[in-house]
């Protein structure tokens, strides 16, 4: 699931919603959003976390982008990396997750392509 800090951020964006009173009302509308998640094991909840973030994007009328349909094991909703079976530094473990990094790269490419289509 999403972290407490991310949930807190999401809750504080109420002023950006359609019924908000902020000068930034609709501030996230039509923005492109792609999701990344890191978990302790492959397919151990990263997909559900990404879906929660995508639901937030949809509430704000954002354009949700996934990592594409390229045939690869991993997550198609966004970028999903794992730290398993590495112990120690999370960054080093993620850098060894070739499948997760591929899904994250695919997501970045798809976000860039979507932005180019909107120009």
Q: Can you say where each PLM-predicted feature lies in the sequence?
A:
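Helix-loop-strand module that forms the ligand-binding subsite of alpha/beta enzymes
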Residues: 1-73
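Glycine-rich phosphate/pyrophosphate-binding loop and the adjoining helix
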Residues: 63-119
């Amino acid at each position: 699931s999403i972290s407490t800090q991310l949930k807190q951020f999401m809750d504080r964006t109420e002023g950006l919603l359609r019924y908000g009173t902020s000068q930034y009302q609709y501030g996230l509308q039509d923005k492109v959003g792609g999701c990344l998640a890191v978990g302790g094991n492959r397919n151990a909840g990263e997909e559900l976390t990404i879906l929660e973030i995508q639901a937030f994007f949809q509430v704000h009328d954002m354009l949700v982008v996934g990592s594409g349909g390229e045939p690869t094991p991993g997550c198609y909703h966004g970028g999903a990396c794992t730290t398993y079976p590495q112990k120690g530094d999370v960054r080093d473990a993620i850098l060894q997750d070739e499948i997760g990094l591929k899904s994250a790269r695919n997501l970045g490419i798809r976000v860039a392509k979507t932005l180019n289509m909107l120009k």
